[in-house]
Amino acid sequence: TGKVDPVSTPDRVLFVGEEYRPAFHGHVYFLDMKDHLLSPFASAYEGTAIHSLYPSNTDIFRLAERQGAFRGYVHPYGGENDPNGGENPSLGGAKAFPVDAALGTVEALEMSYGNHAAYIVWHHMLNNDIKIIPTGGEDSISNLYRTAIVGQLRTYVHLGDRPLSWDNWMTGLRKGHTIVTNSPLPVLT
């Protein structure tokens, strides 16, 4: 809708975003879109009617950017090893992330699991002077027992002296004023 949900309160703000789910390039998200959802919602599922690799994540990111959306990769990499290096690089679940990061079409990388792979890739970006904002979130499917519970990974955004609002939260997020955690709730002073 491009608007804060009516169930929001002064202490909690709800704004619904979108996940684009291509099987090959890697799943991505958009926050703060102002106009409409993007379609198709998925691509590259071999042996189905949506088998095509088009549109790429780069194409979809550019469409989302036209609406002012904040753009990132979700649940990108698992495991402890560098998915882009070593003896058997797999590129992980976010095969197009390094390209999108270099092109500047993506702003964030989600830290989704309690492992090091996404952090390693994030550090590669920083070491190459590519600013990527860390965010936290889990691929939680509430009726599937093997997925993370809702809220297991969180993104905290520093607002400074500004009150909580969607616009203030997004401003802090876009500036990279984030803390990502899967630990107990932090107390920030």
PLM regions with names:
Residues T1, F70-G72:
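Divalent metal-dependent hydrolysis catalytic cores, especially in the metallo-beta-lactamase
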Residues L31-R66:
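Binuclear metal-dependent hydrolase catalytic cores centered on His/Asp/Glu-rich metal-binding motifs
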